[in-house]
Amino acid sequence: MHPRLFITTLLGILLFASCQESKQSTETTPSDFKMILRLWPDHHNDTVLRGELLQAMRTYPNTFEEVWFCAEIQTLSMDAHRKSAAAMAVASQQFRELVITPSLQAITLGHGDSFENGSEDLVPTEWSTITDANGIVTRACHCPRQPKYLAYLEETYALYAEKCQPAIIWLDDDLRVTHHSPARQLCFCDTCISQFNEQYGRTWSRETLVEELETNSGEDGVRQQWIAFSQESLAGVARVISRSVHRVSPKTRMGLQHTNFHRELLEGRDWNLIFKAMEEETGLVPASRPGNGFYSDHAPREMVMKGYDMARQIRRLDPDIKEIAAEIEGYRHYASGKSAHGLCVESLLYLSMGATQLSYAIVCSASEPMEWYADTYFKKLQEWRPFLEEYARYNAGTEPGGWDPYISPQHVIREKQPGEPPFGWITTGANDALLHLSYLGFPFCPDGNHASALVMDAEAISGLTPDEASRLFQQKGILINTQAWEIMQRRGLDTLLTPIPVPEGLNNVSCFVSAQGGRTAVIPSFDASIPNSQRMNLLQIADWAASHQLPVIMESMAQAVVVPRVDKKGQLHSVTLLNCSISEQQETRLRLRGCGADKKQTFVWKKAGQLDVTLHPQYEGEDAIIAIPTLEGWNIGWLAIN
């Protein structure tokens, strides 16, 4: 063969092989991925600020494909809303010219009397406000069942929708039952009590209803009735708004911004009644924005807790809801709050928890010069965007796997505990503390559909109904601590299980089985401040309880968060690794389940700003052993398993 022909042929073969490897490592499915910038009213009202923002978008193109304008939040004046809507319409067109889609967010009931700057213009004169269980009345947070208030919402939302024709209108996370300061919960006003009595054929006053909710002694489930009634109150607000929007802007979809209220049991288990009302009125599938605080990264591990909070919210959504825009919040939007790198790490972590989109509240207050926001935040996010989008596309159709920190759907009807304060049953911190084990590589999947097993603390055990407890402990793998075991004994649940000798290789644990194949492991505590030998022992105990089905085990000593993604068959699809320590993390050994040599899989390590690295595993039966390369302090990457 002629030398030149040989070289040409060889280059062609290498190029083909390279393309095949690239295709194999990055092959994805369609996704709903978007990066979104959230705004406040000044961004459309102030023409100078608007111009600066438009220029920032030109400087860093293809970073955000959508913005959420914000309706006025400090007034009930329709004249003020009309002026604002006119300015928003102009701004919407200007952003469309940059191929950036305008959407809109607006408040509903009000976060609290002082949250929206305590404006006197927010105090209603034509309808009543929220009254809580103790008779505390808000000044500026609105009762959701007041006809004139609903008429106001109908007119206001229709005004903005007609002028701007937004892609989505988002109802703010003040559409909630609890925390409308100074009111602890809604709504015990005369209107709501009267309608509740009419619906259920009762004659409660506020005082007698509160007493019955506290004891929950009747057979008709007053707590459940009141929660359902409260959820219907919120859904009624969403229905009125959705109907008015659809009338003037039929292509506009609705969205709900919600926060993590699985701790606030009066909220109910999910927000699906609101989403259902939105879809019924518009005929369009709504969108979700889960969130829950974490306003600065001064204590960066809090992003992990927020991530797991959002994972639980996401799993409770109707499966038809695919647009899930995680809240990345920088309130008060100071340079001293969130770091650019922190925003990027947070972004991938929330995608790993199940979000499909990212919404950034990082410029809202305009407290810093727009040029600073752009050159600091926009620039870094633009650099990370391909990395984030690839993850979202690759992992579409999968969800986090591992341990489900289980909370009963019926936790709210648990019995009152001795010495418990009034209305102590309306909140729970079940399983919060044990999530700190995630910093040591324990994979969690709150409310996961494909969880390997369950993990519960004493409070979670207290919230189980008898039938539920019987079913779970007879059929599932469960990890609990001694405090939870004491609750089980007190409730007679220990009789469901038979003790067995501690399996070889495990220490400091009591093990039990059931006649139906359940496994229960009881450990002293969920303390995360432990030496590595105890960490590995605890992981092995957890794996035994899961019948050796944990999708991934971090075998190296590291302070790292491990998030496996599994498909509908429970097959491992990817693993995200977050170094949640200050120090550089040396090679990290991961044991990947169900990835035996016969699968002929490839393992590609991905990190922002660096070339992909194909890793070569060792095999032990159906397990692949992978060494993840060095990972810097507070950095994140992910392993694609093809």
Roles of regions detected by a PLM:
Residues 25-57, 63:
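Boundary/entry segment of secreted carbohydrate-active catalytic domains
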Residues 101-164, 181, 192, 196, ...:
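Active-site-adjacent "subsite" loops/lids of carbohydrate-active enzymes
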Residues 53-57, 69-125, 241:
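Aromatic-lined substrate-binding rim segments of carbohydrate-active enzymes
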Residues 35-46, 70-84, 135-154, 218-236, ...:
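The substrate-binding groove and active-site-proximal loops of carbohydrate-active enzymes
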Residues 141-176, 234, 244, 383, ...:
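An active-site-proximal structural segment forming one wall of the substrate-binding cleft
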Residues 60, 65, 71, 113-115, ...:
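Hydrophobic targeting/anchoring helices
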Residues 7-17:
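Bacterial N-terminal signal peptides
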Residues 425-429, 434-440, 444-449, 455-642:
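A conserved amphipathic helix/loop scaffold
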